[in-house]
């Protein structure tokens, strides 16, 4: 007789190896948080480049939450909730290195988290 705990352990093992995927709208907050996480990491890694971009484009502003997240080296994701999806898109796609650096990094991060997006 097979023990119930053996069956449960087998099901748990199968579930752990299967990659869960979720399809979300691009405006979903979970997608935005992944995008913003990549964005904050990119700003930290290329701070001088972002400062030069900001100096050349003074009307391109960042929400205060993004600035706080850049300089807070702890868990910053909770700081970034509530930023409007259109503002996230504007910030991320508004830099010249979006296609070459941010877009591939965002795609990779979403894929790693099992998230796929659909156009709204």
Swiss-Prot record:
**A Pfam family assignment:** SRP1_TIP1
| UniProt keyword Acetylation, yes or no | no
> Quick one: signal sequence residues?
1-25
Keywords on record: Signal
**One Gene Ontology term from the biological process aspect of the record:** fungal-type cell wall organization
Output a single Gene Ontology CC term carried by this record.
fungal-type cell wall
Q: Which domain of life is it from?
A: Eukaryota
Q: Which GO terms describe its molecular function?
A: structural constituent of cell wall
**Family affiliation:** Belongs to the SRP1/TIP1 family. Seripauperin subfamily.
List, alphabetically, the PANTHER family matched: CELL WALL PROTEIN CWP1-RELATED (PTHR31002:SF34), SERIPAUPERIN (PTHR31002)
This protein's name: Seripauperin-13
